[in-house]
């Protein structure tokens, strides 16, 4: 996944809008999730307040808490991708936990790739084709331009094609109702 330019606006001391930063955001990768790249473009752990200076809010976990959000791109390798030896080692998994804090803890042991978070995820497939799997065993194939709204349900993403899949997500922290 390439790096992406990020332009951020804010307000000057007089409340006038201005560009406060114009730079490049680099993707995050980890040997513990081989072939997966994520680019965290913006996020916050609480509601935005304006006017502001446009400084990037601090946040520490992959998934936002209630009232928070993340704006992330995600790439998934093609079906014929072979993970490098050692990618399942303790060291590689520890690296993945540091690189994508809170992500691996949402995965289920009994269904590879299946995970659940307390978020509403709005996703857009930018390129490629990906299969959305759900806990009931259903699968939905999504292609470039398709969107999905993921409402805190257990799901997985599988790339069965020969091309890398790239998706754009807005994750919004949500409250989970008692069952």
Question: What positions do the PLM features span?
Answer:
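A generic structural signal for residues embedded in beta-strands
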Residues: 20, 133, 149-150
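Extracellular structured ligand-interaction cores
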Residues: 4-6, 68-71, 117-120, 129, ...
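N-terminal leader/capping segments at the start of a protein or of a new domain
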Residues: 1-59
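Glyoxalase I/VOC metalloenzyme domain signal
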Residues: 13, 21-25, 47-51, 65-81, ...
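Conserved short histidine dyad/triad with adjacent acidic residue
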Residues: 25, 71-117, 151-154
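A short beta-strand-loop-beta hairpin characteristic of the jelly-roll/cupin
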Residues: 109-143
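Ligand-binding loop in jelly-roll beta-barrel domains
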Residues: 69, 77, 137-139, 143-146, ...
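Double-stranded beta-helix
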Residues: 7, 11-12, 16-21, 98, ...
